[in-house]
Structure formats: C-alpha cells, structure tokens
Amino acid sequence: MSGNAQKKAASRSMATKKLIIDEFKRRLRDNIKSLNDNFYHIIQAAKVNPDDNAFKNQTGKMTEFYTIKNEMAVRAQLMVRASDELLRLTTDLKEFLILHDFHFLTHNIKQAESQCEDTLRQQSHLHQALDTDVSNMLFALEEEIADNFFLGH
C-alpha cells in the first residue's frame, strides 16, 4: 500500500471508530434517560391523592387504582428493558475494546476525564462562592436580629 492509501485507511478506521463510539454514547444516554424518566413517573404515580372529593363513588377510586397499578407495572418493565440494554451495551463495549485500538479510546477517555475535571473544578468554585455568599448573608441576618430584637427569657 502506498502512503496515501494507508492514510485514507487510517482516516476511515478513525471515522468508523468515532461513529461506533457515538452510537455507544447515544445508547447510553437513551437508556439512562429511560431509567430516570420511568423512575420519576413511578414515584409520581405512587403519590396519594389527599382529596377524597375527587372521587364521588368507589368506582372512581378503583378505576384510578388499577390504572396507576398498570402504569407502574409498564414503567417497571421499561426500566428492566433499559437495564438489560445497558448490560448489552457493557458487553458490546468490552467486545469493542478487545477488537479495536486501545490508543484511540484511551485518548478519548482521557479527554472526557479532563473535561469532567474542569467542569468539577468550575462547579466547586461556584459552590464555594455560593457558600461564602450564603454564610455572609446569614451572618448579616444574625447581626441584624441581634441588634434589633431583644430575645430575653
């Protein structure tokens, strides 16, 4: 193979790997979103309606009970399906790592880790600033209360 042909093959290989990784990311994002959404809706459905006037008769209560019960069962099944898909994704990732270039993945993982560390650092600074602001406000509020209100026993 000539130099140009090797470069084209390497470029094509990198593009293919990038597409596969993007597909893995999409699958991961979709399955995690499905887990979160269904869990949220199960928790929402588990809330008890305190308004007894909403049901004029016993049939309305039973209808709502069975509707919610079936909805929760379906959502639980969707969570199981998403979990199963995540297990398959893990297997596919292991297979991909065994069969493909480790250097490319290592580079992408290190890049993602550095982005995460940068984001974490920024969020930590933001949290510290907010913590300081809240502490200052609380201190000023306590001083104001102490100066203006006499709390004697």
Curated annotation (Swiss-Prot):
The keyword Membrane does not apply. GO terms for biological process: regulation of transcription by RNA polymerase II. The keyword Membrane does not apply. It is found in: Nucleus. Keywords: Activator, Nucleus, Transcription, Transcription regulation. InterPro entries: Med22. One of its GO terms (molecular function) is transcription coregulator activity. GO terms for cellular component: mediator complex. Its main location: nucleus. Belongs to the Mediator complex subunit 22 family. Component of the Mediator complex, a coactivator involved in the regulated transcription of nearly all RNA polymerase II-dependent genes. Mediator functions as a bridge to convey information from gene-specific regulatory proteins to the basal RNA polymerase II transcription machinery. Mediator is recruited to promoters by direct interactions with regulatory proteins and serves as a scaffold for the assembly of a functional preinitiation complex with RNA polymerase II and the general transcription factors. Component of the Mediator complex. This is Mediator of RNA polymerase II transcription subunit 22. It comes from Caenorhabditis briggsae.
